[in-house]
């Protein structure tokens, strides 16, 4: 059975894209400006005095607070003579006792502190007396609660999600004829040597 071959497909030729070249606009050149050389005066180096080192530093300070309104009472004093620091501080604790700390610090013994606690000179601050829970002369009354209608119970139903359905595309079928098979012709190669006879 003879089946004719299908007609060859003819395609349109490929069209290359072409772009227009950008327009070249010549702008007048700006006039050349030369900056005049101005001599710059160099700043004179500032004389920096090195911080003086005190081989035997000394200081002394102190303060004191005595506030009768808040009950805050404290003091501190400290002095330094070379590498030895001595000082003390004191404060009134909540129970009315006075705590005093004497301390020293030197290169040989390090930091040492001695704590003294003295009984209070001031009367301890009395704790506040709580007020009675029910004031005197209180009359108990009963008040009816306002009538409130109960709100209706709303039961929310959650709807199932709606899924969109789509039809499948039809299957594209293309009929192709079986290729005709024929033996390829035998190609004979002939070689030529253009320089074969040319010897120098």
From Swiss-Prot:
Region Disordered: start-end pairs = 70-89
Keywords noted in UniProt: Cuticle, Repeat
Q: Which GO terms describe its cellular component?
A: extracellular matrix; extracellular space
Sorted alphabetically, which InterPro entries does this protein's record hold? CHIT_BIND_RR_consensus, Insect_cuticle, Insect_Cuticle_Struc_Prot
GO molecular function: any one?
structural constituent of cuticle
Q: Where are the sequence repeats?
A: 20-23, 26-29, 43-46, 126-129, 144-147, 150-153, 159-162, 177-180
**Protein origin, superkingdom:** Eukaryota
Location of the Chitin-binding type R&R domain: 56-127
- Record-annotated disulphide pairs: none
Entry function: Component of the cuticle of migratory locust which contains more than 100 different structural proteins.
Any notes on this protein's domains?
Answer: The tetrapeptide (A-A-P-[AV]) repeats found throughout the protein are also present in many proteins constituting the protective envelope of other species.
| PANTHER family associated with the record | CUTICULAR PROTEIN 76BD, ISOFORM C-RELATED (PTHR12236:SF95), STRUCTURAL CONTITUENT OF CUTICLE (PTHR12236)
Protein name per UniProt: Cuticle protein 19.8
Q: Which organism is it from?
A: Locusta migratoria (Migratory locust)
């Amino acid at each position: 059975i003879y089946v004719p071959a299908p007609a060859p497909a003819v395609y349109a030729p490929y069209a290359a894209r072409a772009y227009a070249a950008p327009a070249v606009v010549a702008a007048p050149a700006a006039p050349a400006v030369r900056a005049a050389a101005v001599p710059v005066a160099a700043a004179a180096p500032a004389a920096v005095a090195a911080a003086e080192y005190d081989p035997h530093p000394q200081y002394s300070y102190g303060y004191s607070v005595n506030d009768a309104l808040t009950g805050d009472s404290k003091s501190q004093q400290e002095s330094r003579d070379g590498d030895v620091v001595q000082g003390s501080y004191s404060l009134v604790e909540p129970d009315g006792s006075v705590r005093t700390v004497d301390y020293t610090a030197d290169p040989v013994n390090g930091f040492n502190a001695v704590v003294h606690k003295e009984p209070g000179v001031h009367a301890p601050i009395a704790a506040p007396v709580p007020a009675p829970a029910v004031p005197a002369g209180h009359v108990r009354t009963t008040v009816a609660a306002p009538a409130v209608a109960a709100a209706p119970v709303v039961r929310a139903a959650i709807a199932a999600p709606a899924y969109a359905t789509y039809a499948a595309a039809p299957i594209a079928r293309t009929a192709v004829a079986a290729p005709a098979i024929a033996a390829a012709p035998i190609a004979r190669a002939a070689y030529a040597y253009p320089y074969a006879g040319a010897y120098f």
